[in-house]
Curated annotation (Swiss-Prot):
<keyword id="KW-0221">Differentiation</keyword>
<feature type="compositionally biased region" description="Polar residues">
    <location>
        <begin position="384"/>
        <end position="393"/>
    </location>
</feature>
<comment type="subunit">
    <text>Interacts with DYNLT2. Interacts with GGNBP1. Interacts with OSBP2.</text>
</comment>
<dbReference type="GO" id="GO:0120316">
    <property type="term" value="P:sperm flagellum assembly"/>
</dbReference>
<comment type="function">
    <text>Functions during spermatid development; may participate in the centrosome reduction procedure of spermatids and is required for the formation of the connecting piece/sperm head-tail coupling apparatus (HTCA) and the correct and tight attachment of the flagellum to the nuclear envelope.</text>
</comment>
<dbReference type="GO" id="GO:0007283">
    <property type="term" value="P:spermatogenesis"/>
</dbReference>
<feature type="coiled-coil region">
    <location>
        <begin position="269"/>
        <end position="305"/>
    </location>
</feature>
<keyword id="KW-0744">Spermatogenesis</keyword>
<dbReference type="GO" id="GO:0010467">
    <property type="term" value="P:gene expression"/>
</dbReference>
<dbReference type="GO" id="GO:0007338">
    <property type="term" value="P:single fertilization"/>
</dbReference>
<dbReference type="InterPro" id="IPR039284">
    <property type="entry name" value="CCDC159/163"/>
</dbReference>
<feature type="region of interest" description="Disordered">
    <location>
        <begin position="372"/>
        <end position="411"/>
    </location>
</feature>
<keyword id="KW-0175">Coiled coil</keyword>
<protein>
    <recommendedName>
        <fullName>Coiled-coil domain-containing protein 159</fullName>
    </recommendedName>
</protein>
<feature type="region of interest" description="Disordered">
    <location>
        <begin position="84"/>
        <end position="113"/>
    </location>
</feature>
<dbReference type="GO" id="GO:0120212">
    <property type="term" value="C:sperm head-tail coupling apparatus"/>
</dbReference>
<dbReference type="GO" id="GO:0007286">
    <property type="term" value="P:spermatid development"/>
</dbReference>
Length: 411
């Protein structure tokens, strides 16, 4: 209500401010602008708030009242202009009545609204009749006065007064119309509030469902956020574990590389030592081989000398056996001397043979072979008998060939 009152006050102030005090301007104000403004404003209000079809609108009645009042009060020229404008406004009203109104068919046209509308129309008609009755004597007086000779200044003053009266009446009617429109707007707002409440009641289950869905969505979002935080924590822990594993592996690899380097160095040192030892052993073996080869040559020489000695001994034995029966007829004294000489020679020979055999055994021991058991036996006072004497003719045991390796043949 406050906003509508402000609008009405502003419009009234503007209308009052638009009135001029000069006598020349009053006629121009009385001709067309007020009537046009009122009719156009009434048409606008009628377009906003149209009555149901088949009923005359209050705005059209008010506009017609204003035009009739102007036609009775103003001069004939002004009346002609007002009639023309009235015809135009009537044509506009017919056009507005023929056009479909936007509020037709809406649920706002209830029984209460129709009753209030009819009541307002009755009030407007009564006011119209009262205005006609009050204006009839005034119009007669104006006609009488027009016949009389009136000065121009009084005519101008009367015109101004009449224009002011007409404007005040138009403003009062506009105020009434605005009050009516405000009441209609209030009713429409009430109806709209009722509709809004009904719609809210209809939409309340859907809103509850929306709230439920919103809660579910919020819980899901919270769960997703918690899962995302957990995944981020797991990723951080995995990254830290990977970094630790990489650091450990790098440290282990570095330690292994150091150990491998140290082991390589140690192995190279060991290889150098082994090479030195191998070279030393190889040199020693070469020296031993040289010594063995020399010893073998000496043994071969000794064997050859031994063979020669055996041959000599066999020859001497044969000579002794051959000479033995011849010496049987010699006296015993001579036999004793020969025997002693022969025994001495044999003892010397046997000593030489034993010395050679011992030297051969020593060489064999130094070479690592088993010494061969000597088949020669002799003593200082040994007496050879034919049954116990070995066969000196076979020299197969003493003439065995040496092997390629230079080792002495086994016994």
């Amino acid at each position: 209500m406050g906003e509508h009152e402000r609008v009405v006050c502003c419009s009234s102030d503007s209308l009052l401010a638009g009135l001029s005090r000069d006598s020349d301007d009053c006629v121009s104000h009385l001709c067309t602008p007020p009537l046009l403004a009122i009719t156009s404003w009434a048409a606008k209000e009628r377009s906003q708030y149209s009555p149901p079809p088949g009923e005359p609108g209050p705005s059209s009645d008010k506009a017609l009242d204003c035009m009739t009042h102007w036609s009775r009060v103003l001069e004939p020229e002004i009346v002609n202009t007002a009639s023309e404008q009235a015809g135009k406004s009537g044509a506009w009203e017919k056009e507005w009545d023929s056009e479909p109104q936007p509020h037709e068919g809406t649920p706002c046209s209830s029984s209460d609204v129709n009753k209030d509308h009819y009541h307002d129309q009755d009030l407007v008609k009564r006011n119209h009749c009262v205005a006609k009755k009050s204006l009839e004597p005034s119009s007669a007086k104006v006609k009488v006065k027009n016949t009389m000779i009136i000065p121009d200044s009084q005519k101008l003053l009367r015109c101004e007064l009449e224009s002011l009266r007409s404007q005040l009446q138009a403003q009062s009617k506009a105020f009434e119309f605005l009050n009516h429109s405000v009441t209609m707007l209030e009713k429409e707002s009430c109806l709209q509030q009722i509709k809004i409440q009904q719609l809210e009641e209809v939409l309340s289950p859907t809103s509850r469902q929306g709230e439920k869905y919103g809660r579910k969505w919020s819980t899901e979002q919270e769960l997703y956020g918690a899962l995302a935080q957990g995944l981020q924590g797991l990723q951080k822990t995995l990254k830290e574990g990977e970094e630790l594993q990489r650091a450990r592996t790098t440290r282990c690899l570095q330690l292994l590389a150091r150990e491998i380097r140290d082991s390589k160095k140690f192995l190279w040192e060991e290889l150098e030592l082994v090479r030195e030892e191998v070279t030393f052993i190889y040199q020693k073996l070469q020296d031993q081989e040289d010594e063995i080869s020399e010893n073998l040559l000496n043994i071969q020489k000794m064997q050859k000398t031994q063979v020669k000695c055996r041959k000599v001994l066999t020859k001497m034995k044969q000579q002794a056996y051959d000479s033995w029966p011849e010496a049987e007829g010699v006296p015993t004294e001579g036999n004793g001397c020969c025997k002693d000489d022969l025994q001495k020679e044999l003892g010397d020979i046997w000593s030489a043979v034993h010395s050679l055999q011992s030297s051969i055994d020593c060489l064999a021991l130094s070479m690592g072979t088993r010494p061969r058991a000597s088949s020669l036996r002799g003593q200082k006072g040994h007496q050879c008998k034919s049954s116990q004497c070995p066969s000196w003719d076979s020299d197969s045991d003493w003439e065995r060939p040496f092997s390629k390796s230079g080792s002495y043949p086994p016994a």
